[in-house]
Amino acid sequence: MIRLAQQTQVLKGKPPNQFVPHPTKNSLTHPMKFNGTIAMEHHEHNYAIPYTPATFNNPALATYQVSPANHFVPHFGGNIGANNNNHLAQNNSNNSNNHHNNNRNHHHNNNRNHHQNNHNHSKYNNSNQGNSISPDSPWFHKVCAFEDCVSQTLYMSQTPRRQNMKHHSEHPNSNANPLFWDSIGRAMGLYHDLLTTPELNSDRVSKLVHLLHNGLRANRNQLTRMNKKPDYDSQSFHKEMTNYLCKSLREISEDVLNGKVELNEYGAMHLITAFKELLLFEEAVDIWKAAINGQNTYTSNIFLNPRVVGVILPILYDNGVSYPEIQALYEKSSSMINYFHPNLSVGMIRASLSASENDMALKLFQKLCQESTEMKYGYLIETHLSFIGECKDLNVAQTFFDKALNDEMPYKIDLQVSYVKSFLRNIWSQTRDFNHIYQIWYKSSLHYGRNVNHGISSSLNDTFFDIFFENYAVDKMQGFQTLQNIIQTYNNIKHIDEPFFNIILAKCTVWHDRSILEYIDKSYEAYHIPKTIVAYRILLKSMGSVDDASNAEILQRWMDLIRKSDEIGQRFIANADWAALRDATVTWTQNDRDSKKSNMNSTQISRTATPSPSLTPMDTPAPEHLFNNPQNPMDFYSHPALQAATASGAFDEFAAEAASSSIPVDGRMVLYLKIVKRYSPYCRDSRQLARLTTGTAVKYSVLQEVLNQFQTLIVNDIPIPELHNLKPTCV
């Protein structure tokens, strides 16, 4: 094992205030220090921001200055709001320089020894792990091929958080290297071939898990850097690859639990982390519990290793394990080694933050800082981000956020947008202070700058506008004025891109106002932003929020979408295009019908003195209500037998009876069916057409009422524009 420090005990009593300084000027100019009490004071918020909406209140914010200590020691104490501009007193400069030089030498020696230990105890050291294989082995060639495949792991091993000082690193473009994905497929095939051989040892299986995990990272990284979401209608590579990676990880997990293969602690760590990143938290917990409770003592100890427990601790807490049990597991895992493991401490910090045990989290962070060298800054960065996004104490989170933005740490923090979004949601859920939300969004947008990729800015804007429209849902006038100011402000930060307006357009439907939709529509041209097909889909879909939208308006939006679809070279009308039409017509009609029925029932109930003692035949629930009743565990829409019956026409008679209801059928329903019938030749295949008719009717009862009219509808009044790429393939 790699010996990092001479620490065998969990923190007790008051932690030390002197940390090993960083051997560069940053440790002197931007120090941090903890006080033992870690008492937090309240933060007010006041930032100078252009175009601040007139309704915002801007109370004074007590500015925060970093402690003038000459050591890299985080400080969040009682003087958190104090002004202190004397970071380095002149009369202490000589002592500071001497201390800097001494510690630089100390760091050099430690790093050299640590590097040597890392080399001697490499996690994938062939000689130590028994990876050598005789050429006489019948599996020699397949083992060599397997080693060649998993060597791609080294190419993708660095994560975005593992950065040294001010240097940035990014994943390579996975799509630009098809050999990477080819290696994954070949490696899994060779895994199957070698499954029953002794050559498939824990080291080789662990490297394969590492490769699969890095495949997830590469896939996610590529998605984040795309200018637009992939069109899943066209068999998205990213979706297929995610499914393949998940299936492969599950297969290896099952083999581990069944005793067919084994993992080392690195492989187990990557396995649990991969399921966490797939958002399969319960599955990660189940695998870990099964491993530690299984009959294989080796596997049980591997999954109790600090490197693995550090990953599972916060997941366990979020899945119902009590904090005392988390502490006990932390102690048990700590006792398995004789040094302070950063992975374990990071996991305990995150679990403590989730449990609002902030003092414990801060003390562990202090010790993590003390034990960390530049080689281990990735752990500090990850923990710093956790304090921003996961700490429920907004004052603590705000302090860590400010330090990241102000570049006050010796390590360079890549401010990952997911943590900023979590911080925004925590602020909103606790305070409902939209002014504070605005300040964090504005400062984050400035931090990301003009050249940030669309995936990051869109992700931040999506959460921000979720909160914005929730805040102004019932105050359309003030909200629209504020929205105009925000658009101007954002354009000063970076050039507005199409996703920015797409997000606003999709969310402003809460106001049900045609004029606002038209304003956003015109804004694309005003800011010289060419609209992609995504914008045309949202514009059509948004008609479902306008109660007085005419059929002519909806038809025109549909025609615009079809022209754009043809322009970009689509060969058939995509599912996303049909979904936009459905939401503008069928969904609106269903919601309108349900709202009217609800109001009618409320009126009848208010006029009834006593409830009916029993159900009469007239009171018997209709089939769709029977299966959609929340008290009934059967889901009507997902039941395969009922879906098949609907598709076969078994409910046509019922639909005909419903059509004679006294409630009139809305014209949008007829428009939907006429457009579907007129453009049905441009469907991908007959199955797509079936989903648009009988399939959609399963979910929307209003469509059942008119579906029997489909074959007799006259659709000559529905125009088809001149098309060049869309072809009638479904005749």
UniProtKB/Swiss-Prot annotation:
Gene Ontology biological process terms from the UniProt entry: aerobic respiration
Main location: mitochondrion
Tree of life domain: Eukaryota
Chain spans, region Disordered: 1-29, 77-133, 590-630
Bilayer disposition of the protein: Peripheral membrane protein
Subcellular localization, as worded in the UniProt entry: Mitochondrion inner membrane
Phosphoserine modified-residue sites: 132
Signal sequence residues: none
Cystine pairings recorded for this chain: none
Modifications the protein undergoes after translation, according to the UniProt entry: Phosphorylated. Phosphorylation promotes binding to RNA.
Molecular-function GO terms, alphabetical: mRNA binding
Compositional bias ranges of the Low complexity kind: 83-100
An annotated GO cellular component: mitochondrial membrane
Biased composition (Polar residues): 1-10, 598-617
Biased composition (Basic residues): 101-122
Keywords, comma-separated and alphabetical: Membrane, Mitochondrion, Mitochondrion inner membrane, Phosphoprotein, Transit peptide
Subunit structure: Monomer.
Extra remark beyond the main annotation: Present with 2080 molecules/cell in log phase SD medium.
Protein role: May be involved in the processing or stability of mitochondrial mRNAs.
Similarity comment: Belongs to the RMD9 family.
Name of this chain's protein: RNA-binding protein RMD9-like, mitochondrial
Organism for this UniProt entry: Saccharomyces cerevisiae (strain ATCC 204508 / S288c)
Source species taxonomy: Eukaryota, Fungi, Dikarya, Ascomycota, Saccharomycotina
